[in-house]
Amino acid sequence: DLPGFLGKGPQDRRRLCRERRTLVAERVAHVNRIKGLLFAQGIADHEPLHGNRRQRLEALRTGDGRPLPLYLKAQIGRELDRLELLLEQLKTVEAERNALLEPTNDVAPVAVKALAGLRGIGPEFTAMLWSECLFRSFRNRRQIAAYAGLAPTPWQSGSVRHEQGVSKSGNPR
């Protein structure tokens, strides 16, 4: 293996967390788009992620009591189609991620299984840590801190020396 080159397993595992992050961002965009379209009609209390979103859409009235315009309702319906597709894809990706983290899975190392068993650490955080950094070998704690973006940033001018705080140059994931 080349130095710094990830094998096929670790590289492939990263895709699950990254795809989920992309899907969540797209879900937020669709929800915001639907809410924006409805807010322009004086409707501020519609939640597109609730299970009864289609029934609520049919019952919605504009701020002045009129039914939603026909083409607006059709556009929101298409947005809901895309949102529901995203929700299904999210379920699929999360099921694949959860299967990978199962204690009976031979692929997950002991450290990952122990991490998944801790209270307060969910499957997304466990999968993200495993796919982004736990497979790497660090020689010391400075390398870990630098990878996480927690390395100090010194500043020096003449005889004046200060710590500027923590660097934000590590892996953003």
Task: Identify the residue ranges that each predicted region occupies.
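Glycine-rich, often acidic, oxyanion-interacting loops/wings at catalytic, nucleic-acid
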Residues: 8-114
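Short capping/connector residues at structural and topological boundaries
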Residues: 7-10, 54, 62-65, 143, ...
